[in-house]
UniProtKB/Swiss-Prot annotation:
Optimum pH is 7. The gene is caiT. GO terms for cellular component: plasma membrane. Pathway: Amine and polyamine metabolism; carnitine metabolism. It comes from Proteus mirabilis (strain HI4320). Changing residue 111 to A: Abolishes transport activity. This is L-carnitine/gamma-butyrobetaine antiporter. Pfam families: BCCT (PF02028). GO terms for molecular function: (R)-carnitine:4-(trimethylammonio)butanoate antiporter activity. It is found in: Cell inner membrane. It comes from the Bacteria. The lineage of its organism: Bacteria, Pseudomonadati, Pseudomonadota, Gammaproteobacteria, Enterobacterales. Catalyzes the exchange of L-carnitine for gamma-butyrobetaine. Its main location: membrane.
Length: 514
């Protein structure tokens, strides 16, 4: 075996432990679901109620850091010596497609119902103030604030990979300027990487858990095929197969094509909902919600409700911030990989403006449509959820539109492709992170990429078959706590190294390889 091939091989200490840990967690969870639910819910309650303030301050501080990057002395620094690998349009499309999935369509269609039925700030459910703040909170949770945290970390990873010419692309390797090479190559670095990989694998399982029943309900609506475990397994297997085909063509071809198709189809479906779902109301509702967001944003940023104890910030804001934290490193590594040649300012502005526009578009159109269906008594969403579950309620919000069969076909295809692009990005990053070394411009071995997608698919099928996905989904949020600290360390390491290297290229001018 050649030296290069050997360097591209699997790193056992970060490849096998996550698989073993995930297997043990699955076994412990499904061994006694009732007991597991009690333990996991208790942990979730403890994290969100006792440490919720930490997630809120994290988001605020990272948002301030984004302004520092955009307007500071590093704004014009280029992340790599070559021209951008992708056109600006394809670059934004790839970011949008890889950072969203059927989970976005899931929450975009139903989230507003939860906000208006159990609103924050002591408001009465289904009241006018509750409906006014409903979309505003969605714009808050899926707006500039979280995307800014991703752009900061993306700059950090792009800096270490393309400017500092690092051969390893996983979280621990970026911490050399902060903790030293000895600790990075020792137990500390191994623990950091394994925390990251375990959280990523479980997060992908959660995404499959949201997407699979949504697609299954589409199939039941279109073909009358009942929801079974066999159908779940077939759907996940198809996703894994399509992902294997995509990665076989490499990052440039496979991901770009899937991302472009997903993005164009998203705009097509959203345009249809916008036109037939009441364009005038949706635009007016969005405009009013932006004003509501600006009015309430200071309180939203720091809302923990310790006096009223209504539970809204714990159930939603802290939950979403923890969700963003879990995906931050994984997505930032991928976003850094496709942002080679961009300036710091270009990456920060491109991510926040482009991705915020995309998520705001989705939540405004889908949320506005759902609100109208509730107001006009076309759908009884609480009854649908009680009798059939949340996925059926979401399907009915789409089926209520004109040309329901054609609409459902479009929604089915969109959910399917959206999840393929997410799995594609995740499996690619998993492969990069579990190889011994990655040189600039190189891609992880094909078999490793396909192998990760297959293994994650198997985990998803097992979780669905055993019925243990729901407690695992809750455990992911609590499990995001270690990544909270890892994200902070990566950020501090970047700031420390850039302060020296981008000033006079000394003393860290030597190539950092681990």
């Amino acid at each position: 075996m050649s030296k290069d091939n050997k360097k591209a091989g699997i790193e056992p200490k970060v490849f096998f432990p996550p698989l073993i840990i995930v297997g043990i967690l699955c076994w412990l969870t499904v061994r006694d679901l009732d007991a597991s639910n009690e333990v996991i819910n208790a942990v979730f309650s403890y994290v969100t109620n006792v440490w919720g303030w930490a997630f809120e301050w994290y988001m605020v501080i990272m948002f301030g850091g984004w302004f520092w990057l955009v307007f500071g002395r590093y704004a014009k620094k280029r992340l790599g010596d070559e021209k951008p690998e992708f056109s600006t349009a394809s670059w934004i499309f790839m970011m949008f497609a890889s950072c969203t999935s059927a989970a976005v369509l899931f929450w975009g269609s139903i989230e507003i119902y939860y906000y208006i039925s159990s609103p924050p700030f002591g408001m009465e459910g289904y009241s006018a103030p509750a409906k006014e703040i409903g979309l505003a909170y969605s714009l808050f949770h899926w707006g500039p604030l979280p995307w800014a945290t991703y752009s900061f970390l993306s700059v950090a990873f792009a800096y270490f990979f393309f400017v500092r010419k690092m051969e390893v692309i996983r979280p621990s390797s970026t911490l050399t300027p902060l903790v030293g090479e000895k600790h990075v190559n020792g137990l500390f670095g191994t623990v950091v990487d394994n925390f990251y990989l375990v959280a990523l694998i479980l997060a992908m399982g959660t995404s499959l858990g949201l997407a699979t029943p949504l697609v299954t309900e589409c199939i039941q609506y279109l073909f009358g095929i009942p929801h079974t475990l066999q159908l779940d397994a077939i759907i996940i297997s198809c996703w894994i197969l399509l992902n294997a085909i995509c990665v076989a063509f490499g990052l440039q071809k496979g991901v770009k094509i899937a991302s472009d198709v997903r993005t164009y189809l998203s705009f097509l479906m959203l345009g249809w909902v916008f036109i037939v779902g009441g364009a005038s109301f949706i635009v007016n509702y969005f405009t009013d919600s932006v004003g509501t967001l600006l009015m309430y944003m200071p309180r939203m940023l720091f809302y923990t409700d310790p006096i009223g104890k209504g539970g809204f910030p714990q159930a939603w804001t802290v939950f979403y911030w923890a969700w963003w934290v879990i995906y931050a490193i994984q997505m930032s590594i991928f976003l850094a990989r496709i942002s080679k040649g961009r300036t710091v300012r270009e990456l920060c502005l491109g991510m926040v403006s482009g991705l915020t526009a995309g998520t705001w578009l989705i939540w405004t159109i889908l949320g506005g449509n759902t609100l109208q269906l509730i107001d006009q008594n076309i759908l009884n969403i609480p009854q649908l959820i009680d009798q059939y579950g949340v996925p059926r309620a979401i399907i009915e919000t789409w089926a209520a539109l004109p040309l329901s069969t054609a609409t459902m076909w479009g929604f089915f295809i969109l959910c399917f492709i959206a999840t393929v692009t997410l799995i594609n990005a995740c499996s690619y990053t998993l492969a990069m992170s579990t190889c011994r070394s990655m040189k600039e411009g190189a891609e992880p071995p094909l078999l490793v990429r396909i192998g990760w997608s297959v293994l994650v698919g198997i985990i998803g099928i097992i979780l669905l078959a055993l019925g243990g996905l729901k407690p695992i989904q809750t455990a992911i949020i609590a499990g995001g706590c270690p990544l909270f600290f890892v994200n902070i360390m990566v950020t501090l390491s970047f700031i420390k190294d850039a302060k020296v290297h981008w000033k006079d290229c000394s003393p860290y001018t030597q190539k950092m390889t681990h």
